């Protein structure tokens, strides 16, 4: 029996995935990605490496933004965010994410919070890590019902896109050249 929990392993894996970045932004409802970012910062400090800037939306202690999402988007557009986390109610094999809902619009069977800024961040942040603790056919579908943010975009130059998908059971990497 290992001397660590599954969640501790996920947090350590997140820190490994973030290695080498200067600035990571984390959403308000993302405790494990935030813990992974803080673990990376602690590792860097112990190794006397450059301090990682962490922006956790909604946090008074770990957020240098005074106007939340607006400043995050400005910082991202200027190329000053190296990593970000996205999840989704549905995720498919092309790394498309659905944050809208399932079923036929406008009478969706399930409705999720929406996609505020997800496509923008997905296009511009160089290292987007898809994170979803649940690993099930309900989440991982052949094709998402709605594309809130596309994983890959043919014929479009974009610095961002999927870097990895981490679940409670597995770590997947992405090859943007393959669909």
Residue ranges and their predicted role:
Residues 1-69, 80:
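N-terminal active-site beta-alpha-beta segment that forms phosphate/nucleotide-binding
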Residues 61-179:
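Conserved phosphate- and dinucleotide-binding cores of soluble alpha/beta proteins
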């Amino acid at each position: 029996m290992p001397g660590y929990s599954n969640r501790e392993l996920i947090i350590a894996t997140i820190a490994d995935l973030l290695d080498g970045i200067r600035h990571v932004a984390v959403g308000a409802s993302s405790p494990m990605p935030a813990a992974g970012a803080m673990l990376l910062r602690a590792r860097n400090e112990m190794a006397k490496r450059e301090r990682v800037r962490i922006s956790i939306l909604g946090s008074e202690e770990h957020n240098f933004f005074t106007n939340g999402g607006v400043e995050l988007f400005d910082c991202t557009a200027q190329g000053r965010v190296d990593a970000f986390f996205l999840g989704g109610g549905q995720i498919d094999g092309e790394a498309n994410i659905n944050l809208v809902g399932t079923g036929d619009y406008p009478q969706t069977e399930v409705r999720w919070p929406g996609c505020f800024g997800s496509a923008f961040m997905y296009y511009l942040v160089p290292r987007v890590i898809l994170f979803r603790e649940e690993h099930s056919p309900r989440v991982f579908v052949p094709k998402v019902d709605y594309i809130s943010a596309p994983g890959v975009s043919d014929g479009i130059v974009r610095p961002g896109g999927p870097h990895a998908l981490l679940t409670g059971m597995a770590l997947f990497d992405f090859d943007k050249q393959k669909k």
